[in-house]
């Protein structure tokens, strides 16, 4: 009962905004009684996240080799029954010590390995790199339901999620090479002369790596070689830095979208190019992507509402294109498909072992096209070229 109450509160309000007294009140006991079960909020978060991971992913690691389609359908149903997994793992588990996150992460790695084995058993032509990418992407489809707020009747919803997982599992992808230097190389890249821009870049990286709550102005100042108090010459507060970073990412995405719409006349071509441009943005700016996924809750009310509305408006542009290409598709189905594409792209961008492989941009693009029901003709920056691969299962 305590774990269930904590899970709901952490997902609804965010770990940083929930006190042990809030959890105690939710289960009708005093705070002192709660501390007899858990020594602190962090221990409770660990228990909540571990339980969610085991409940959602346990079936993958214990399943025997067999019907991949049936396994994916069962996983789709489980992911919908435990929709909190994505929020808990991607957003809230950042508040745990590194060793505990690594321990919990082994649940995901075990599930990924199990899925990769199932995929290679069903598709003997898959190499290790592609099997790993497809397995991670199937997990990301499951995680994406945490960020979906749609009303689909049963069995339509699990059938749709299972279909998306199946599209990933059967996708024929371009070459995926060895690991290359991370992008962009922070060790070799030139830095802006502007002190404000240097502070913004350093803070964005620190917020992404440690979480907003764990970073001080002194940390940011040290990263660029100035005293923490000097930051006030450029930003009024730590919150203003976060708001500036969020605004920077939003404006970049809208500029990309505007350029896409101005460069093509066909909705399908626009959607293909938008998938590519979003993948390019995410892979090059993984720290900004991390802030979008994990730190929005730390914005002050006005900035948070403005940021969320901007994100909703941006996604609505994707939905408009999807439904222009597929007029019979319901708004709810289009939203589920788009969220799956964005979640896969974001997670790959935030996962070094995937992000740093040569050819990853083209692979992400192909997966996105498959999930949105586009053919294998890749529209690339103003020209159409047919890639020499086998079609995805449609």
Range-by-range predicted roles:
Residues 122-187, 325-369, 379-384:
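Hydrophobic/aromatic-rich alpha-helical bundle segments in the mid-to-C-terminal region
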């Amino acid at each position: 009962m305590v774990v269930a109450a904590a899970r709901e509160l952490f997902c609804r309000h965010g770990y940083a905004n929930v006190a042990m007294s809030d959890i105690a009140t939710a289960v009708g006991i005093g705070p002192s009684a709660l501390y007899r079960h858990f020594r602190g909020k962090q221990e409770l978060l660990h228990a909540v996240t571990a339980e969610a991971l085991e409940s959602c992913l346990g079936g993958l690691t214990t399943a025997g080799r067999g019907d991949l389609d049936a396994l994916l359908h069962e996983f789709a149903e489980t992911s919908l029954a435990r929709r909190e997994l994505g929020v808990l793992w991607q957003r809230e588990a950042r508040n745990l010590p590194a060793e505990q996150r690594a321990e919990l992460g082994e649940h995901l790695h075990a599930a990924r390995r199990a899925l990769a084995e199932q995929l290679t058993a069903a598709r003997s032509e898959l190499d290790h790199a592609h099997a790993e990418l497809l397995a991670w992407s199937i997990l990301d489809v499951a995680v994406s339901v945490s960020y979906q707020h749609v009303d689909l009747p049963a069995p339509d919803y699990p059938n749709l999620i299972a279909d998306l997982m199946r599209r990933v599992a059967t996708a024929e992808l371009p070459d995926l090479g060895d690991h290359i230097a991370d992008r962009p190389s922070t060790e070799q890249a030139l830095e802006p002369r502007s002190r404000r821009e240097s502070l913004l870049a350093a803070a964005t990286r620190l917020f992404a790596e440690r979480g907003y709550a764990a970073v001080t102005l002194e940390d940011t100042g040290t990263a660029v070689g100035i005293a923490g108090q000097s930051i006030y010459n450029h930003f009024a507060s730590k919150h203003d830095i976060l708001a500036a970073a969020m605004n920077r990412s939003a404006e970049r995405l809208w500029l990309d979208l505007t350029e896409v719409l101005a460069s093509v006349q066909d909705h399908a071509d626009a959607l293909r190019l938008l998938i590519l441009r979003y993948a390019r943005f995410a892979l090059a700016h993984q720290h900004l992507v991390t802030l979008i996924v994990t730190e929005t809750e730390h914005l002050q009310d006005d900035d948070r509402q403005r940021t969320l509305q901007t994100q909703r408006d941006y996604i609505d542009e994707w939905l408009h294109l999807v439904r222009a290409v597929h007029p019979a598709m319901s708004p709810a189905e289009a939203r589920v498909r788009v969220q799956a594409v964005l979640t896969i792209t974001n997670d790959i961008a935030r996962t070094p072992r995937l992000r740093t492989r040569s050819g990853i941009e083209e692979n992400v693009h192909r997966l996105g096209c498959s999930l949105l029901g586009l053919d294998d003709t890749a529209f690339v920056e103003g020209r159409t070229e047919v890639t020499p691969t086998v079609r995805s299962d449609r």
